[in-house]
């Protein structure tokens, strides 16, 4: 069973601030989703070919082109930490600097 503390932990990792009501709501909703996934794990899928797309459709592509973004300050205004025009995030890998 999913606990409220686990939801708080995941919210913290995602840098989300949840109200008490949201914590309760998400705990219930995520517990329901996880219970459904457990039901799916019990299904016998032996011999069932994996489905990647329901419809045979290809997404249109375009050439990669560098284009200036018009509102960089607007995006960076939501960053918990930044250095000049970049998001600053905690180091997660050890080794090379």
Swiss-Prot record:
Recorded hits in InterPro entries, A to Z, give: Asp/Glu-ADT_sf_sub_c, GatC
Q: Which SUPFAM superfamilies match?
A: Glu-tRNAGln amidotransferase C subunit
E.C. number? 6.3.5.-
> Which reaction is this enzyme known to catalyze?
L-glutamyl-tRNA(Gln) + L-glutamine + ATP + H2O = L-glutaminyl-tRNA(Gln) + L-glutamate + ADP + phosphate + H(+); L-aspartyl-tRNA(Asn) + L-glutamine + ATP + H2O = L-asparaginyl-tRNA(Asn) + L-glutamate + ADP + phosphate + 2 H(+)
Q: Does the keyword Ligase apply?
A: yes
Per UniProt, the keywords (alphabetical) are: ATP-binding, Ligase, Nucleotide-binding, Protein biosynthesis
Molecular-function GO terms, alphabetical: asparaginyl-tRNA synthase (glutamine-hydrolyzing) activity; ATP binding; glutaminyl-tRNA synthase (glutamine-hydrolyzing) activity
Q: Does the keyword Ligase apply?
A: yes
> Can you supply a Gene Ontology BP term from the record?
translation
* Subunit relationships: Heterotrimer of A, B and C subunits.
UniProt lists the family membership as follows:
Belongs to the GatC family.
Q: What does this protein do?
A: Allows the formation of correctly charged Asn-tRNA(Asn) or Gln-tRNA(Gln) through the transamidation of misacylated Asp-tRNA(Asn) or Glu-tRNA(Gln) in organisms which lack either or both of asparaginyl-tRNA or glutaminyl-tRNA synthetases. The reaction takes place in the presence of glutamine and ATP through an activated phospho-Asp-tRNA(Asn) or phospho-Glu-tRNA(Gln).
Descriptive protein name: Aspartyl/glutamyl-tRNA(Asn/Gln) amidotransferase subunit C
Q: Which organism is it from?
A: Synechococcus sp. (strain JA-3-3Ab)
